[in-house]
Amino acid sequence: MTSYSYRQTSAMSSFGGTGGGSVRIGSGGVFRAPSIHGGSGGRGVSVSSTRFVTSSSGSYGGVRGGSFSGTLAVSDGLLSGNEKITMQNLNDRLASYLDKVRALEQANGELEVKIRDWYQKQGPGPSRDYNHYFKTIEDLRDKILGATIDNSKIVLQIDNARLAADDFRTKFETEHALRLSVEADINGLRRVLDELTLARTDLEMQIESLKEELAYLKKNHEEEITALRSQVGGQVSVEVDSTPGVDLAKILSEMRSQYEIMAEKNRKDAEATYLARIEELNTQVAVHSEQIQISKTEVTDLRRTLQGLEIELQSQLSMKAALEGTLAETEARYGVQLSQIQSVISGFEAQLSDVRADIERQNQEYKQLMDIKSRLEQEIATYRSLLEGQEAHYNNLPTPKAI
């Protein structure tokens, strides 16, 4: 390696990285060093050059590590301090940019590998096949729909049973009121029957009294007739010669016939009245007895119907309680299953959202990295073109002799 030395100024520059291996470069000659002022990406670059002679040794590092070092022996009059610092800063920036590019490329590769692995793991496969979940969810939805329909039918049946029970209760209350009314009528008829019985007894007593009175009248009549006959017989014997006699037998016969006619008439009237009252009472008793029998039959039928309805109501209430318990158990079981499935779906959706957000973030980072890479490539190309142009220019210069 050739070495050139000058009196006063020397410079050291290095490109550092994070990679392993290095390339040693040795060169000598007179150079006009470029001084580059500009921003990232090579925009607004201005170049100035100064003649200098270098004695350098260096190494270019890879992505992970390494260094580029050089020793410059520069003429005091050929390279100013500002341009030397600018060149050193440019070398440092180039090295850091190269390190960043390679590190970002490697990180990008690792990220792509991770994304590919994640997609392979999260991709459709036997462990990530959600078709059976969809089928289970569809079956559960069908079962829930069926249970809802059955529940609606049961609720409708319960409402119908409740309406029927209310109807039967209304009928029972009506029939009960009718029964009470019939029983009240029966009690009234019994009182009427008792009154009629008392009236019949009274009439019988009146008839007996009339018969006794008639017998008494007959006896008195006979006694009066006997007394009159005895009186008339004495008068006839006394007055037989004075005046014509009165036909007392005829008078008595007429009186007797009149009394007999009156007694027979009274007897017939009393008997007719008694028979009419008895016939009327018998008719009323027969009618009321028939009504009582019909009412008793209706009450028996209603009691039997009420017992049947109460039994049916109890069975309907028992079936309602059993169906409500079954419905609550079914809703609880399917609610737990549905909540579990919803939790699984929510977990998958959260994972999918995280993956999408991660992919979006990685895309943004990748775009930023590609933008930085493109700008770095532009700066590297600009720097390389400048170095190649200056190197070609300096190679054409005469080589100074070593001192």
Curated annotation (Swiss-Prot):
Pfam families: Filament. The modification Omega-N-methylarginine is found at residues 7, 24, 32, 43, 51, 64. Residues 391-403 are annotated as: Rod-like helical tail. GO terms for cellular component: apicolateral plasma membrane; cell periphery; costamere; dystrophin-associated glycoprotein complex; intermediate filament; sarcolemma; terminal web; Z disc. Residues 119-136 are annotated as: Linker 1. The keyword Nuclease does not apply. Residues 83-118 are annotated as: Coil 1A. The modification Phosphothreonine is found at residue 326. It comes from the Eukaryota. GO terms for molecular function: protein-containing complex binding; structural constituent of muscle. SUPFAM superfamilies: Intermediate filament protein, coiled coil region, Prefoldin. Residues 1-82 are annotated as: Head. The keyword Phosphoprotein applies. The record marks 270, 330 as: Stutter. The modification Asymmetric dimethylarginine is found at residue 24. Residues 247-393 are annotated as: Necessary for interaction with PNN. Involved in the organization of myofibers. Together with KRT8, helps to link the contractile apparatus to dystrophin at the costameres of striated muscle. This keratin differs from all other IF proteins in lacking the C-terminal tail domain. There are two types of cytoskeletal and microfibrillar keratin: I (acidic; 40-55 kDa) and II (neutral to basic; 56-70 kDa). This is Keratin, type I cytoskeletal 19. It comes from Mus musculus. The gene is Krt19.
